[in-house]
């Protein structure tokens, strides 16, 4: 039908992947009649840089009413009151996990962490059976409830590169300090040590987790700033500006 349809006034393509083939397919209108130039809406500056194309950047929407912080607890400044929980959430596929993290997961329980990995049953044969190391299927707990149950969110992927990384922002919206590998679209919004943490190596990640474990005030301040960051990203004025782009 596009071959015979009347060309639209504007042609906007919301592009949220890294696949260059998609660019070739969408750069030109179909048929013999002239179509308007394709306008791209991208979801991160990281994606824009990696692809080397022009486009409007609109972060992938997050429901910040659903993903909200848990109420303050009396023991939040008492590290010995309960085991601290570090965890991550993703699809249960091998490309979502980095093999370098296996060694880290093995050591964290001995340091006093409880580790919760939802969407990690694919790692079961590579990790020891340990009550403090929980591997659960993808979707076994509601995402918002799972993230609110963490003290720290940890994230690094394997072959899969996050164009945006929704789950990182969902964790930030829940007021959870995030510790993430630097290579991903989420890194555009993380100010290291202020509203989250970025690392390049496993040793750096381990050092950050050690610091957070022993500094409850830092966990609280970074989590609070993380929530504010996401609120700013999806404020009424920011959402209105994005709608104005489509309506113009």
Locations of the language-model features?
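Extended catalytic core of nucleotide-activated donor transferases of GT-like folds
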Residues: 1-36
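Short alpha-helical segment that forms part of, or immediately flanks, the ligand-binding pocket
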Residues: 144, 166-173, 187-188, 194
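Conserved acidic donor-binding segment of nucleotide-sugar-dependent glycosyltransferases
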Residues: 192-203, 211-216
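A charged, aromatic-enriched C-terminal amphipathic alpha-helix characteristic of glycosyltransferases
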Residues: 72, 216-247
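Conserved catalytic-core segment of nucleotide-activated headgroup transferases in glycan assembly
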Residues: 62-141
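Acidic donor-binding loop of glycosyltransferase active sites
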Residues: 148-163, 176
């Amino acid at each position: 039908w596009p071959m015979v349809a009347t060309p639209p006034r504007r042609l906007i393509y919301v592009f949220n992947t890294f696949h260059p083939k998609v660019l070739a397919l969408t750069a030109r209108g179909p048929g013999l009649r002239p179509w308007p130039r394709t306008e791209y809406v991208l979801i991160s500056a990281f994606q824009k840089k990696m692809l080397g194309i022009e486009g409007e950047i609109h972060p992938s929407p997050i429901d910040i009413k659903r993903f909200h912080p848990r109420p303050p607890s009396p023991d939040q400044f008492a590290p010995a009151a309960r085991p601290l929980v570090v965890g991550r959430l993703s699809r249960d596929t091998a490309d979502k996990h980095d093999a370098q993290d296996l060694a880290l997961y093995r050591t964290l329980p001995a340091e006093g962490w409880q580790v919760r990995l939802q969407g990690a049953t694919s790692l079961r044969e590579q990790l020891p059976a340990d009550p403090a190391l929980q591997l659960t299927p993808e979707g076994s707990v509601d995402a918002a409830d799972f993230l609110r149950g963490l003290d720290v969110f940890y994230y690094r992927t394997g072959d899969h590169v996050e164009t945006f990384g929704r789950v990182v922002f969902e964790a930030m919206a829940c007021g959870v300090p995030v510790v993430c590998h630097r290579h991903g679209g989420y890194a555009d919004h993380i100010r290291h040590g202020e509203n989250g943490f970025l690392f390049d190596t496993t040793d750096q990640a381990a050092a950050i987790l050690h610091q957070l474990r022993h500094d409850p005030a830092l966990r609280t301040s970074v989590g609070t700033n993380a929530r504010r960051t996401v609120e700013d990203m999806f404020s009424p004025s920011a959402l209105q500006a994005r709608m104005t782009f489509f309506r113009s």
